[in-house]
Amino acid sequence: LIKITAAVATGLQLLLTLVLWQNYDAGNGGMQFTVRGEWIPSFNISYILGVDGLSLPMAILTALLCFIGIFVSWNINKAVKGYFALFLLLDTGIMGVFLSMDFFLFYIFWEVMLLPMYFLIGMWGGPQREYAAIKFFLYTLFGSVLMLVGILGLYFTCGNTFDIQVLKQVAPEALQGVTWWGMSAIKV
């Protein structure tokens, strides 16, 4: 049942991203299909999702690869429910990273994405999966801390907001570059 649920969920996600692509106005540019809700108003944290010309293809590719990934993983026999639950949680985290328009929400989705990856590597990985999972954890922990410092730096120096659209307008050009490189350090 969990395999069918995962296949249906990722199939619906793929279908919805293709509908977004069909209805996306490329001539308009900017963010479209925006969903906004106040989340933690005392810290100016909002739940903001949307797509633009860069995030929409990434969302479509994520949906397609996750849909294919379910069927590639169909013959998993070890802890099947746990595997597919972690796979769907990973899918949710990746999709949230591409759709979030609030840095706090982005960071939450980023961490949501990393946890299932750690367990998927550690439990269903190859012969050296424990070593790989620990190494993955240490690298991503270091990168996540650097990214959090960059996000908090933006928050405290640019008007106490995590809203990416607002930050694009108020953040000084130099600060944007420093923050970008700081957040890109997670790739190293």
Regions found by a protein language model. Give the residues of each.
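Alpha-helical multi-pass transmembrane bundles of energy-transducing inner-membrane proteins
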Residues: 1, 82-89, 93-188
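Transmembrane helix-loop-helix hairpins at membrane boundaries of multipass inner-membrane proteins
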Residues: 1-85, 157-182
